[in-house]
Design a protein with these regions (language model features):
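Charge-dense, helix-prone N-terminal extensions
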Residues: 5-11, 20-23, 48-51, 61-63, ...
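Hydrophobic-ligand binding "helix-grip"
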Residues: 36-37, 43-44, 54, 58-102, ...
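A conserved amphipathic terminal alpha-helix motif
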Residues: 109-159
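Charge-dense, low-complexity polyampholytic segments
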Residues: 44-45, 141
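Tryptophan-centric aromatic hotspots in well-structured domains and transmembrane helices
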Residues: 29, 76-77, 122-127
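Sparse recognition of residues in long alpha-helices and their boundaries
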Residues: 40-41, 80, 138, 146
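Hydrophobic ligand-binding cavity/cleft-lining segments
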Residues: 1-44, 156-159
Length: 159
């Protein structure tokens, strides 16, 4: 008997413009305390290639594949309720614009039943709160800030 198994996977692509420098955007994503300011949840993020990370109160975990400060982050990334051995690959490419940063985001390997929730989740629990921090001019020093609604979406599996 021969059994084969396939997992359908999907890709998310989003482009976001922030009114902060690429270095500031990079730091919000890679610094544990700043990430906690964004999410309002615990984060433990290694700053080393091969190092592990956990975010959103351990709902998200993975490890760093490529780290180029102020330019690029590539991570093997998974949600706690995905298939045990399944990681997606997330890429954050940062580019300087006049007065800000263009972030090109790609997530390859999202389970199809989670696509809609993750697509919205990046917007609602990362990009919108990051823009709010940028608009306040406090990307680098904002204290815990995610809304209760954003945390509830994480708890419900939207990201």
């Amino acid at each position: 008997m021969k059994i084969t198994q396939e997992r359908d996977i999907t890709t998310i692509r989003q482009t976001v413009i922030f009114s902060a420098s690429p270095e500031q955007v990079y730091e919000v994503l890679m610094d544990s305390e700043k990430h906690e300011s964004l999410s309002g949840e615990n984060a433990n993020i290694s700053r080393e290639v091969g190092g592990a990370f956990e975010a959103w109160g351990e709902h998200i975990s993975g490890f760093n594949l490529v780290l180029q400060p102020g330019r690029r982050i590539v991570q093997a990334w998974r949600a706690h309720d995905w298939w045990t051995d399944h990681y997606s690959i997330v890429t954050f490419d940062l580019r300087t614009l006049d007065g800000g940063t263009e972030l090109r985001f790609t997530q390859i390997g999202v389970p199809p039943h989670r696509f809609d929730g993750h697509f919205r989740g990046w917007i609602e629990t990362y990009w919108q709160p990051m823009q709010e921090l940028c608009d306040k001019g406090s990307v680098s020093d904002q204290t815990r800030g995610a809304s209760a609604a954003a945390r509830q979406r994480i708890d419900q599996g939207s990201l």
